Amino acid sequence: MSSAPAAGTASTSRFFKSHVSETDPDIFSAIQKEFGRQQHEIELIASENIVSQAVLDAAGSVLTNKYAEGYPGKRYYGGCQYVDIVEDIAIDRAKKLFNCEFANVQPNSGSQANQGVFNALAQPGDTILGLSLAAGGHLTHGAPVNQSGKWFKAVHYMVKPDSHLIDMDEVRKLAQEHKPRIIIAGGSAYPRKIDFAAFRAIADEVGAIFLVDMAHFAGLVAAGLIPSPFPHAHVVTTTTHKTLRGPRGGMILTNDADIAKKINSAIFPGIQGGPLMHVIAGKAVAFGEALRPDFKVYIKQVMDNARALGEVLVQNGFALVSGGTDTHLVLVDLRPKKLTGTKAEKALGRANITCNKNGIPFDPEKPMVTSGIRLGSPAGTTRGFGVAEFQEIGRLISEVLDGVAKNGEDGNGAVEAAVKAKAIALCDRFPIYA
């Protein structure tokens, strides 16, 4: 006599076999629409990129099911033998990629990586010295609205008014005056190389820890196409997306064993619990991709494309902060066209070109208005755009923004429609996840 199926067998089978398209059409619809947006819009947000199918596979794997508080070999849960393998691989690849001795791959974001460093190496009320947000710095470097600006006494250096390069004389003066616990180099909208040796010399003069936040340019460092923060930095933080082309997350690197020990404790149990093992797997895959020779070819193209884009914009009457770029991004000063960043971002969005409004040094406009836009080449380069395509993108941007300059905020509808069609056609020539 055959036994009846166990209660719940059918529903259990559906649970493990049904895709989101079947179980949650609202979410599936939003995902599909976002895929369509990414497929048919020119992505110029400098902090965004497009991951490989392999990274997507790892980040969407069964590793999401596993809790793994602690570190490889020292977990607070059983059954971690395979996620230990994943995290060890991620750590080893990160150390090889950046030629350093220690790596913590658990931070869930660049912000949490920075918070972890502060938690490890400073006390509330200590002074930190970083690049002003108004000059291209980052919120987590002591902006008043950020936790870093609430917990610490934040002092900020600027760029020079004429060149828009970091004013190292001011850095030294402020360091000597305020004796910061931590000096920070790096930012979110600074398009030039940074003199890490000069920063370290100042840090040594005042007994400060030197932190480099290379979230934006980590891929360029990994490829060996701009100078590495090591051996100058005591500690380095980064995101794992942006130019590294991995999943969204953070990482902390150092060559100092004592700092590494403090960092590990600061991340867990200090500010995080169980790490996101599926994301760490995605990081490991991305690091492996970045260790291949073709990654250097990719990053060189990223840099060439950013320069080409900037040159076309200058030819069409725009100004570039610092006069150009050494990296993956250009910061465009819109004042020669009498435009604001808000108007430019909206108009370009209508034409299927995605970017973000951004303040420029000594910006007369409010932070939610701005006098600039920030443009980056990583995502477009990932999908295959070369110099010719970025030159065309520069011309398309110019056409749209000239329409806004002439006609006001609503722009030139006919021009925007024509540019949108060209943007879609360009993207169709270089499809993603085809």
From Swiss-Prot:
Annotated site location: Plays an important role in substrate specificity: 241
Residues that bear N6-(pyridoxal phosphate)lysine: 242
Pfam families: SHMT
Subcellular compartments: Cytoplasm
Catalysed reactions, as listed in the record: (6R)-5,10-methylene-5,6,7,8-tetrahydrofolate + glycine + H2O = (6S)-5,6,7,8-tetrahydrofolate + L-serine
GO biological process, one term: glycine biosynthetic process from serine
CDD domains the UniProt entry points to: SHMT
InterPro entries linked: PyrdxlP-dep_Trfase, PyrdxlP-dep_Trfase_major, PyrdxlP-dep_Trfase_small, Ser_HO-MeTrfase, Ser_HO-MeTrfase-like, Ser_HO-MeTrfase_PLP_BS, SHMT-like_dom
Enzyme Commission no: 2.1.2.1
Pathway field: One-carbon metabolism; tetrahydrofolate interconversion; Amino-acid biosynthesis; glycine biosynthesis; glycine from L-serine: step 1/1
Key word Glycosyltransferase present: no
Enzyme class: transferase
Major location category of this protein: cytoplasm
Gene Ontology cellular component annotations, sorted alphabetically: cytosol
Keywords of the record: Amino-acid biosynthesis, Cytoplasm, One-carbon metabolism, Pyridoxal phosphate, Transferase
Example GO molecular function: pyridoxal phosphate binding
Cofactor or coenzyme needed: pyridoxal 5'-phosphate
Annotated (6S)-5,6,7,8-tetrahydrofolate binding sites: 133, 137-139
Subunit structure: Homodimer.
Family indicated by similarity: Belongs to the SHMT family.
PANTHER family registered for this protein in UniProt: SERINE HYDROXYMETHYLTRANSFERASE (PTHR11680), SERINE HYDROXYMETHYLTRANSFERASE 1 (PTHR11680:SF35)
Function: Catalyzes the reversible interconversion of serine and glycine with tetrahydrofolate (THF) serving as the one-carbon carrier. This reaction serves as the major source of one-carbon groups required for the biosynthesis of purines, thymidylate, methionine, and other important biomolecules. Also exhibits THF-independent aldolase activity toward beta-hydroxyamino acids, producing glycine and aldehydes, via a retro-aldol mechanism.
Protein name: Serine hydroxymethyltransferase
Species classification: Bacteria, Pseudomonadati, Pseudomonadota, Alphaproteobacteria, Hyphomicrobiales
